[in-house]
């Protein structure tokens, strides 16, 4: 959890926002997936947001669902994902690693056992996409016991009560939704976030990162101009993987270049 605090302090000193890519672990196969993570980090990723493939992803658009299906086709299991996480952590000791996942994958080993496993492999945060704040007590309590940051989604229409809860229970960062709906680069982000960002700051919430529909450098700049601490991009990155399944090296080069361009947009100095 402390890796996020360290990162945000360093970025503040450098007058930069955070750029955080999302990919599904094991897409398109375990070996290439680890190379993808390396390419994202070489491109300048400040933190990682990683999905564990799940058969029924409610909040995901077709792009991210496709990533999960490719990982399944390659035989990737949650146990294998944890082995990959341990390998990523060993190779990259300082980068914050977040998981974005669904409750069934947490229930399956048992809530406490799941967070204990996260702590063992060096995961810093967990966002459980289908658990609303008001039902989050068992998850966030287990997370805190194991020094894992519980991450909450702040929707664009959040009322004051919800903002206070998110600020009170969340750690690490706050996932600021650009808009309601499923993920995807097609629906470009276009909501004024100043109000939410100001309220979250007033309630001392963890730094907000804007996600959903981030696919171009100007959207990253706009998120930071609105007061967000950075931006998360998922579908646009997974589309690069999808486009180059037959050209693994081109895929890695394109991913690195894409991250470099969006990371460059976080530099405000």
From Swiss-Prot:
NCBIfam families in UniProt: trpA
Q: Which family, according to UniProt?
A: Belongs to the TrpA family.
Kindly give the Pfam families that the UniProt entry links to this protein. Answer: Trp_syntA (PF00290)
Assembly and partners are described as:
Tetramer of two alpha and two beta chains.
Q: What is this protein called?
A: Tryptophan synthase alpha chain
Q: Which organism is it from?
A: Klebsiella aerogenes (Enterobacter aerogenes)
Kindly indicate whether the keyword Lyase belongs to this entry.
yes
Task: Identify the PANTHER family for this entry.
Answer: TRYPTOPHAN SYNTHASE ALPHA CHAIN, CHLOROPLASTIC, TRYPTOPHAN SYNTHASE, ALPHA CHAIN
A single Gene Ontology CC term? cytosol
Q: Which InterPro entries does this chain map to?
A: Aldolase_TIM, RibuloseP-bd_barrel, Trp_synthase_alpha_AS, Trp_synthase_suA
Q: What class of enzyme is it?
A: lyase
Pathway(s) per entry: Amino-acid biosynthesis; L-tryptophan biosynthesis; L-tryptophan from chorismate: step 5/5
- SUPFAM superfamilies, sorted: Ribulose-phoshate binding barrel (SSF51366)
Xref: Gene3D superfamilies: Aldolase class I (3.20.20.70)
Keyword Cytoplasm present in the record's keywords: the answer is no
Q: Which UniProt keywords apply?
A: Amino-acid biosynthesis, Aromatic amino acid biosynthesis, Lyase, Tryptophan biosynthesis
Q: What is its EC number?
A: 4.2.1.20
Q: Which gene encodes it?
A: trpA
Q: Catalytic activity annotated for this protein?
A: (1S,2R)-1-C-(indol-3-yl)glycerol 3-phosphate + L-serine = D-glyceraldehyde 3-phosphate + L-tryptophan + H2O
- Domain of life where this protein originates: Bacteria
Q: Which GO terms describe its molecular function?
A: tryptophan synthase activity
What is the annotated role of this protein in its UniProt record?
Answer: The alpha subunit is responsible for the aldol cleavage of indoleglycerol phosphate to indole and glyceraldehyde 3-phosphate.
Q: Where is the active site?
A: 49 (proton acceptor), 60 (proton acceptor)
